[in-house]
Amino acid sequence: MSNKLGNIPQIKLGLVAVSRNCFPMSLSEKRRDAVAAAYAEKYDREELFVCPTIIENELDMRKALGEVNAAGCNALVVYLGNFGPETPETLLAKYFDGPAMYVAAAEDDCGDALIDDRGDAYCGMLNASYNLKLRGVKAYRPEYPVGTAPEVADMIKEFIPIARAVVGLGNLKLITFGPRPQDFLACNAPIARLYDLGVEIEENSELDLYAAYHDHDGDERIPALVEEMAAELGAGNKMAGILPRLAQYELTLTDWA
């Protein structure tokens, strides 16, 4: 069945590396590129935009934010290539209009970049998580968010359906019908958590729905919609006589203002 309403968001991820200024920026850059290469090898490279700016400070953060927005990214992967600067790396998720995930680099061979090859971002991930909590910024972190380049690539892929759900819900509007007048939101349903997800809710009168349904009596679009429904049902079309009424009801809802 085709997705006629286009209501399944396509996710484009922005991969943004961060670096604390007491570490060489090249370490985060090298590790970011390794993650991007691992992702391209295992998955669809077109899903991932590699942000050219590496964030060390707030000015970098604003530049990177502009770059991911210009690239059309609707989800963010903040990658701690080393310990990471807590303020700008968490402000990025605060100002980005979409879901964000935080992941970090495990220890690897840093070559001449660091003494004793130390360079994992485990401690930085702990501090980033603490800072996100202090700011009240919601961001996804995998159960174990520190890994090698291939492991981080897998984490990014696993984030896509989560990001898709968040983006989809954030653009969702529920139009409900009840016994009260139009847009009279006095229901006792537990809607607070829906608001937390960015979902909008508008309650309308059942009497208005009834009137709108009959406004579509004899609608010229009904026969074509009935044919489409019958084709979708195929052998499962056991109650063909009800399809005109269902088509009229569907048109009533899709025309709802």
Could you tell me what each predicted segment is?
Residues 1-257:
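An N-terminal assembly and electron-transfer interface module characteristic of large anaerobic redox
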